[in-house]
Regions:
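Charged interaction/catalytic cores of defense and host-pathogen modules
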Residues: 1-137
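Conserved N-terminal substructure of TIR/SEFIR domains
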Residues: 128, 138-166
Length: 166
């Protein structure tokens, strides 16, 4: 039986949401390991081809003022570039404990350290996994479309209508 990689990614997000300061790195490393699986390499290469993580981080850090929590991430306009940056960011955070702690403290500030990590998870990682799955399943940038809902209601009549059968 094959394991659904997207369900495994979602499980990592759930684990990260419930993690403590002492153990948040394990689900983050698991997430990065799953994202680097062999089946996703071509998609990842396509997403990261036009993005530079260090430039993005430098531009974002320039927005920080003297007030804690004032830094704002400077995302590009293209959805694929945003996904690529988030992918590189998750990989870097999984590799470097100090970077992950400082990044969450700078851009997702809260007085409680674990709350900074949970803010990062809920506002960056969870949407990334959702959008990444959509991107991979479509193999390109999905174009939003309006679909009319189709009714799945079934009308069942209970009774004894023998004449209708003949």
């Amino acid at each position: 039986m094959a394991i659904d990689i997207f369900q495994s990614l979602k499980n990592c997000v759930f684990d990260l949401q419930r993690a403590d300061v002492q153990n948040y790195q394990q689900p983050l490393k698991q997430l990065a390991r799953l994202l680097n699986s062999e089946n996703l390499q071509s998609v990842n290469a396509h997403l990261t081809r036009n993005v530079e993580l260090d430039t993005f981080l430098a531009r974002s850090e320039d927005t920080e003022s003297s007030m804690a929590g004032s830094a704002v991430l400077q995302w590009p306009d293209e959805p694929a570039d945003i996904l690529g940056l988030k992918l590189l960011l998750i990989e870097k955070m999984a590799d470097d404990n100090n970077f992950s702690f400082n990044f969450c403290h700078t851009f997702f500030y809260d007085r409680n350290i674990i709350e900074s990590i949970r803010k990062f998870t809920s506002s960056l990682v969870a949407p990334f996994v959702r959008d990444y799955q959509l991107y991979v399943e479509n193999q390109h940038d999905p174009e939003p479309a309006v679909f009319r809902p189709v009714s799945r209601k079934i009308f069942i009549v209970h009774g004894h209508d023998n004449d209708a059968l003949q």
